[in-house]
Amino acid sequence: MKITLKKTLAAAAVFAFGGTLAAQAIGSKPVYLLSANPAVTIEPIATTGDKIGGLIVRGIPDGMGAYDNGQGGITILSNHEVAINDAIAKKSASTTSTWGATITKFNYSPNSRTITSASNLFNDVNFWNYNTGAYQKTPIGGEPKNNSKDSFGWGISRFCSATFSPAGTFIYNGVGYDGALFTTGEEVGDNSRGFAFDMFGNGWQLPRVGMLSFENIVPTRKPGPNTVALMNEDGSATDS
């Protein structure tokens, strides 16, 4: 499967537009940032609680990425740092499918300066089993032998910062993956997992990044036969 993405845009650029108007709320949307430059207007285009199509925008947006989708618009990916111990999140707890933290896929039109659609990015998540050394469709039983039994569950907790890496980042001389990936990880202590998602919502747990309280997973853009990822630890973990 070949994925072609023409251009990468910084997520911040999606939210900042050149203009002469003072920053102000659009409709009922609050403004969280004020421009220090009179030539720049910052306009909120979506906020928690907005209903776009059939999707209600979730809270705690965190790591983001954006790219030219080749259809005259910009696609924005946004983490929601929802913890599985949150009372509202627990209402959607499942023993057969992922729940908790999610990634929203927004499509933005530069012409109308509006979000035209929004959906949950998740389509299929492949979990790593540290005991068999293979991927499986369930997280159950995949934890390392020295971890508590069933410490890996369907709940995904606190996706924090994230990195969008464009197509071409992970392939060299025809070897590797030729599509774009969105990398992120849980931020809940030394049992946290790292993940990568393609633009179709297929996700893979990344066993070789280890288990730690991830702030971000940042693959380097330098071409070569190996991929180097930089990771920093946050949250309450101090001994990984």
What spans do the regions from the language model cover?
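Gram-negative bacterial Sec-dependent N-terminal signal peptides
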Residues: M1-Q24
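Conserved small-residue
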Residues: Q24-S240
